[in-house]
Amino acid sequence: MIVMDQIAAMQALMRQYRREGKTIGFVPTMGYLHEGHTSLIDRARAENDIVVLSVFVNPLQFGPNEDFARYPRDFERDRRIAEQHGVDVLFHPEADEMYPEPLTVRAIVQARADVLCGRSRPGHFDGVATVLMKLFNIVMPDRAYFGMKDAQQVAVVDGLIRDLNFPIELVPVPTVREADGLAKSSRNVYLSPQERSEAPALYAALQAAASAVERGERSAAAIRRMVREHIEAHTHAEIDYVEVCSYPDLTPLETLAGTVLIAVAVRFASARLIDNIMIELPKTGEQGDGKGEQACFARS
């Protein structure tokens, strides 16, 4: 495995791979790798000649009162995990390599960024889009891999790739969960034992909502109320949002139809957790297949 920390050298290596006709799969991360990240790496390994992993805690996507300074970091551990999973190139730049001076140009995400997490984290997705534009230009991948735990980020990246004509295939990968249903996250290390015992209630609430949809519930208000009541009954967390929206455009829904995202975010004392579930339903006005409107769960 090659470890790189300089942009110019990284670009030269990527050009060499391209001259050799090799396909490049890219997994951008902020490090502190877990099974969610390794599922992305493994998928990239299966589909590409070269797998590139970036580990960079991007300061642009953290707000002034967020956890940039204490975000978990352990590069040697990340290096070992990357090598074990067959990463070819590990790109680990410092902040002053990525941002040597104040930016004169940065991304502003016009759509899909002012709802869900974007409502309480203004500028977050602008920072995500800015660093991804830089990383895409550095790595020049054929495919980029993102986890569906952050479905809003995947939607934003989808728009970024399409609107700016990056010749990159976006590959969404299903959420990886603990045995009790909690979505894998680097921020789970912040949870106290009590909070950790309560956190699986997020996915349980989403599953209960999905079951209600499967039984025929189509009211977004009813689904939101059901999820909120379950979380309030089983945790001490403060609910940031419970939303039901279309995907990938993230338009809030009143009646469930088409591709539906049910998404939640909560705040425990030291950790903000997100989760979601995706449901496929007939679009409004579509004829069924004679078997009724059975929900199809595309991603978990």
From Swiss-Prot:
Beta-alanine binds at residue 61. ATP binds at residues 30-37, 147-150, 176, 184-187. CDD domains: PanC. Gene3D superfamilies: HUPs, Pantoate-beta-alanine ligase, C-terminal domain. It catalyses: (R)-pantoate + beta-alanine + ATP = (R)-pantothenate + AMP + diphosphate + H(+). Its EC number is 6.3.2.1. GO terms for biological process: pantothenate biosynthetic process. The active site is at 37 (proton donor). SUPFAM superfamilies: Nucleotidylyl transferase. Keywords: ATP-binding, Cytoplasm, Ligase, Nucleotide-binding, Pantothenate biosynthesis. It comes from the Bacteria. GO terms for cellular component: cytosol. It is found in: Cytoplasm. Pathway: Cofactor biosynthesis; (R)-pantothenate biosynthesis; (R)-pantothenate from (R)-pantoate and beta-alanine: step 1/1. Pfam families: Pantoate_ligase (PF02569). Coiled coil: none annotated. Disulfide bonds: none annotated. One of its GO terms (molecular function) is pantoate-beta-alanine ligase activity. (R)-pantoate binds at residues 61, 153. Homodimer. NCBIfam families: cyt_tran_rel, panC. Catalyzes the condensation of pantoate with beta-alanine in an ATP-dependent reaction via a pantoyl-adenylate intermediate. The reaction proceeds by a bi uni uni bi ping pong mechanism. Belongs to the pantothenate synthetase family. This is Pantothenate synthetase. It comes from Geobacillus kaustophilus (strain HTA426). The gene is panC.
